[in-house]
Amino acid sequence: MSLVSQNARHCSAEITADYGDGRGEIQATNASGSPTSMLVVDAPQCPQAPINSQCVNTSQAVQDPNDLEVLIDEQSRRLGALRVHDPLEDRSIALVNFMRMKSQTEGSIQQSEMLEFLREYSDQFPEILRRASAHLDQVFGLNLRVIDPQADTYNLVSKRGFQITDRIAESLDMPKASLLALVLGHILLNGNRAREASIWDLLLKVDMWDKPQRINNLFGNTRNLLTTDFVCMRFLEYWPVYGTNPLEFEFLWGSRAHREITKMEALKFVSDAHDEEPWSWPEEYNKALEGDKTKERSLTAGLEFWSEDTMNDKANDLVQLAISVTEEMLPIHQDELLAHTGKEFEDVFPNILNRATLILDMFYGLSLIEVDTSEHIYLLVQQPESEEEQVMLESLGRPTQEYVMPILGLIFLMGNRVKEANVWNLLRRFSVDVGRKHSITRKLMRQRYLECRPLSYSNPVEYELLWGPRAHHETIKMKVLEYMARLYRKRPQNWPEQYREAVEDEEARAKSEATIMFFLDPT
């Protein structure tokens, strides 16, 4: 088993242990490498599935004003459990939540209501309000505005610089959208990929986020929000970094972020957080301008270089390139890989490379390691196979109908792609040891019967399988459909959609063969 596979399983077990009861401590490594303990409050978990806009449990407006005090008391109880040492900071964060709830339910906030909420801290109201106003500005993108000086009435107004949140307002509330924009901008400043540790370091350095407790006070379980919720919504991708021990992870822009957010918007957002202008990073500024122009041209042409299918296709192309140079074991420069992928894919190249690296590791026993991070030079390393894996591969021999046809048939019946787990549920009927599944898949992929695509929105990463080029060359869909019909004791016509596709496939092949014969024998 590869190092990544072992660490991924270990990581999954740790996460389960840490969040099993919704409370506990997580260890986030900061930039210096030392662990930082962060207390975690209860947070709803996002389901592991292709997600619609309901995936993340965003803040909801309180419908019944009578419930407001209950919610505030619950929030205060949680804040008290965090043992924040500065009572004024405690109250300022609680006041932020109070003002947001009042704004959502009533549209305005009375100073008398805030004083009543603060109770014994009301004599410290000016300082608490100053801190709360700063938090609203820096995290939520909201200005606290006086709308009636005589009645001491306030409301919350969105800042002009936060238009980025408008397009994702249906999925995320303002603070989460702001956090996402900050992380996306940070990724942009780090060459379109950012280590997880650097994200935590950023959150701990940006103004009010100088204490881990405050991060979780405002966002709930922030680690789950970044590594699970934003991932399953496809705003972020979260991948292992190969060649690191212990295993590290990095964040990239997800396909939805590429589609809905411009690079200049993200750059402006993160520059505001650093009290800088976007052109303070001239290289990234120019790349953002060019990248947004390229994106506009591609949308006009009806192309999406960042779509999941396109990136997975390019990843499999890189896999085949890597396999072709395996015997030489020569270093590969990133420019060579990018040239093979296509210059137009430069912005999403890290996404493509991570997919290819994961496929190589899981199914080919190869590790693509960046041996020179400054020059971006990679080396393809053969992983030593355990004796058990060697026996499994040798025992499989040449793929037979016993394995190939059921897998190809299931893929065809499931819409020409199927999750790997579903394949092994089928093969249990053939008394196939599920423990051998990666060995079987590895064998079939090496022989080009199958292609593998990681599902970037899943954490831990799942895979789907498709027909490979050899399968398309050696068999036809009708033959596979007839095999599955015999297996299930049905007729091919019992799957009308697949039957129609198989007939069209036969007709297309016959037409192609006729055309070839015409040119070979024009007489």
UniProtKB/Swiss-Prot annotation:
A Pfam family the protein falls into: MAGE
Classification via SMART domains: MAGE
Disulfide bonds: none
InterPro entries: MAGE (IPR037445), MAGE_WH1 (IPR041898), MAGE_WH2 (IPR041899), MHD_dom (IPR002190)
GO biological process: negative regulation of transcription by RNA polymerase II
GO CC, one annotated term: nucleus
Keywords (A to Z) from UniProt: Repeat, Tumor antigen
Ranges where the MAGE domain occurs: 88-288, 311-502
Keyword set includes Repeat: yes
Annotated protein name in UniProt: Melanoma-associated antigen E2
Gene this protein is translated from: MAGEE2
